[in-house]
Amino acid sequence: MAIALAWLLVPLAALAAPYADYVIDVRTGEVLHQDNADTRLHPASLTKMMTLYIAFEAIERGEITLDSKVTISKHAASMPPSKLGLKPGQTIALRYLIRAAAIKSANDAATAIGEAIEGSEPAFAKRMNRTAKALGMTRSTFVNANGLTAKGHLSTAHDMTILGRHLFYDYPQYYNIFSRTSADAGVAQVASTNRRFLAAYKGADGIKTGYTQAAGFNLVASAQRGNKHVIATVFGGKSTADRNARAAQLLDMGFGKAPNRAAVQKPARPAYTGTEPPELLVEDTTDEDDALAEAIARAVTTAPDAVPAGKTIRLKVAVVQSPRPRTRPLPGATEPADAPAEELLLAMQDDIAD
């Protein structure tokens, strides 16, 4: 009986949650340290980094705007805490859902974002998985938009670090939301779940916390000092304090190893994003190639933004593209589009984060 009582006194998070970490030089992508980094573990609310990445992508592609009014479903409203407290039938601007998901880590807001973009959470999860594959997150699979524990909803310290780097380089106009310690989320003023780390670690600028009983205490931490920029990801911390201390130690290690000067090598933005099929290049078409092209065309007609059915182009180069405006690089490009001008960046950041 005494042994049983002793077990009951041990925090559940301390009994579970395998540990993993990963540290990179953000400028080059160079790995500075790793431990258990490719083990598939529960990401918890680190998941919302992918939800937000897709939200930024959808805004850029013209699928939705920051001012779009989102009607909250019963499903989204039913999500457990952390939450914004949204009610079924309530309408709220997408910008407030983004703030709530990024800063407060609100599960109802994250679910509502997914439903607003893809119509349902399962459809959004499929898009999350397509995007993960395109980003090179080869050991991540997503089931929901918020990170609540679910069978098959897993990622790695390596993959979440890749995602953090892409958020920084692919969407610089929105990245500063991750450094905010509070924000107006429309129906409430929300405080950051990462505010302690942001306040305590010099140069910290994000990115996202995560916690569930199965995951333990997770964090993708980013900091910039001088010319250096390091991301350190921690999975399976024993507490908020333990997680933050580990992240600080890893960042210190990273800053110590990273050279003062390094040529920036931005990650290539994915050629295949969202509901858009991969571009197909066929030099000498065969029956097998033609069948593949037709299969891709058929897949497009089942997507939420389907092109007109029956329009299959069978040339030397068969390209199927989304009808929306794009700022993606051309096929073969190694660099993303240029960042907006400084004054435009500031205005866009104010739109979402202030």
Residue ranges of model-derived segments:
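Bacterial N-terminal signal peptides
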Residues: M1-P11
